[in-house]
Amino acid sequence: MEYSSVFDVAIVGAGPVGLFTVFQAGMLGMNSCVIDALDIVGGQCAVLYPEKPIYDIPGYPMITAQDLVNNLKKQAEPFAPVYIMGQFVESISEGPDCFVLQTNKGTSVKCRAIIVAAGSGGFGPNRPPLDGIMEYENKSVFYNVSQMATFKNKKVVIAGGGDSAADWAVNLAEVADKLYVIHRRKSFRCAPNTLKKLEELADEGRINVLIPYQLAGLDGENGELRSVVVRNITTKEEIPIGADFLLPFFGISANLGEIVNWGLGVEGFQIPVEQSTCRTRRSKIYAVGDIAAYPGKIKLILVGFSEAALACQDIRAVLFPDTPLNFQYSTSKGIPTL
């Protein structure tokens, strides 16, 4: 498929920052398309933790990840973005007047500027090395929580010691019948406030924390768990824990895919940018959100929102040099019509 029109901006990535970039571009009179390898918008927020509460979005004391995604998508709707989902950009070629992006499914998109808002790129869970685990996946073994109600009055085992493990332990303690947290070490790598809540719930007997233990095996049939076997790292003793669900939170494996071949000077999993404009080393290609790197960078959604505004302001000046921008606050000009 080939889109005949030339978009002002092509946004690579439909996570929260990518969605807000649609809005920022639209507020400056620029139309856009959004390309993402996932079938749904929202990135990790929608796929890995839609019901996880987020506390550091300005104006929201608390908002779930999915509600944030829904609000951002609704905010972008007046600008009628074209969503090209379930596809990733394989190549970028540059002509005299525009870029041409080719996806893995043969879609061709023309645009005048590109904003990469791809987060950490493609992602997938780090699967624990347990025999037969794939038989249970998406039945009684999950790497994310999409609906907390699934675990109501159930026996749940959480494995891991990072933010996801600790956050979900605290949240699922409100609904689970029994909740176990399995961790190899005494220390957890999570926010201090979350750790405090975790310890309080453990003291109250609402969470059973097993340290130093690791996963050793699964027991069940037809994809339904009966128990999770854990092993004491010090004594090597193994014990079964009755369980309906196992949630292994060992992080995700990120993959930037073809982005590393776009001539953007990728370092690790990030693209170096000019802090004030989010320009990359290629003209008219920008990077925002977690994938953008500069001295002092903080990986927060709200920082990505700011970067989206900076990039769109610069793109508008580059694409329309003869049309000065009369800056106005949104409270004064409202939502423009493209």
From Swiss-Prot:
GO terms assigned for molecular function: ferredoxin-NADP+ reductase activity; flavin adenine dinucleotide binding; NADP binding
EC number assigned by the record: 1.18.1.2
Cofactor note: Binds 1 FAD per subunit.
Name of this chain's protein: Ferredoxin--NADP reductase
Requisite cofactors: FAD
Family note: Belongs to the ferredoxin--NADP reductase type 2 family.
InterPro entries according to UniProt: FAD/NAD-bd_sf (IPR036188), FAD/NAD-binding_dom (IPR023753), Fd--NADP_Rdtase_type_2 (IPR022890), Ferredoxin-NADP_redctase_2 (IPR050097)
Residues the record lists as binding FAD: D36, Q44, Y49, V89, F123, D290, T331
Broad enzyme group: oxidoreductase
Catalytic activity as recorded in UniProt: 2 reduced [2Fe-2S]-[ferredoxin] + NADP(+) + H(+) = 2 oxidized [2Fe-2S]-[ferredoxin] + NADPH
Top-rank taxon: Bacteria
Subunit architecture: Homodimer.
Keywords, alphabetical: FAD, Flavoprotein, NADP, Oxidoreductase
Disulfide bond sites: none
Pfam families: Pyr_redox_2 (PF07992)
Organism the protein comes from: Anaplasma phagocytophilum (strain HZ)
